[in-house]
A protein has these predicted regions:
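Active-site metal-coordination segments of metallo-dependent hydrolases
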Residues: 17-29, 70-82
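Divalent metal-dependent phosphate-bond-processing catalytic cores, especially two-metal-ion Mg2+/Mn2+ enzymes
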Residues: 2-3, 18-46, 54, 64, ...
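An active-site-proximal "capping" alpha-helix that borders the catalytic cofactor pocket
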Residues: 30, 34-37, 77-93
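A generic structural signal for nonpolar/aromatic side chains embedded in well-ordered alpha-helices
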Residues: 10-13, 108, 129
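Short alpha-helical hairpin
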Residues: 1-12, 53-60
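Metal-dependent catalytic cores of enzymes that make or break cyclic nucleotides
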Residues: 61-77, 118
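His-Asp-centered metal-binding catalytic motifs of divalent-metal-dependent phosphohydrolases/nucleases
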Residues: 46-67, 83, 105-112
Length: 178
């Protein structure tokens, strides 16, 4: 049994505010890709999808003269740092297991290397989230401007919740029968 679902997260006005700011369609697409990758790589789908959904909630839009300035954004980007903290706080308030909330937050922190120099040795969970994000990227950050309705996003997240629940139930059943 999961403490917090994707639907629980999406129902929070605070979460929807930041998901829409960073690109709701991108967040949902990355969540779906993370589910598929996590299944393929035998990574916890619950943690992977939560981290994927929330991976960009730290975004701040950089404008110059009323226009989106992608170069200015890239120079000053710390969205993964801000997003990891926001996600952790949100998940704890929703009742997520503290260890799971930390794993999710750290996966968000390391989903990109845009704010630091050098390389990072990622865990399997962190790699799934990073790969899912990279798979949906478009030049100049255009992936953040794809459009999806809130109702369509809610339906897609509910479908993912169902798949994760079935997988969790199946895994629990298999563990009990061993």
């Amino acid at each position: 049994m999961r403490n917090v679902t994707l639907t629980d997260i999406f129902q929070l006005p605070f979460a929807r505010k930041y998901l829409k700011r960073a690109g709701l369609a991108h967040a949902v697409t990355v969540t779906q890709k993370a589910y598929d990758l996590a299944c393929k790589e035998a990574v916890n789908t619950d943690l992977a999808t939560k981290a994927a959904l929330l991976h960009d909630i730290g975004h701040y839009t950089w404008y110059r003269d009323g226009e989106w300035d992608f170069d200015l954004y890239k120079q000053n980007d710390i969205h993964a740092i801000k997003g990891a903290e926001r996600a952790h706080k949100m998940l704890i308030r929703l009742g997520e297991n503290p260890e799971a909330a930390k794993e999710i937050a750290v996966a968000i922190l390391f989903h990109t290397d845009s704010y630091f120099q050098g390389t990072v040795q990622r865990t399997s969970l962190q790699e799934v989230v990073a790969q899912a994000d990279e798979a949906d990227e478009e030049p100049n950050g255009n992936h953040h401007y794809k459009v999806i309705s809130e109702s369509e996003a809610a339906e897609m997240l509910a479908d993912l919740d169902d798949m994760i629940e079935k997988q969790c139930h199946s895994n629990t059943h298999l563990q009990q029968s061993v």
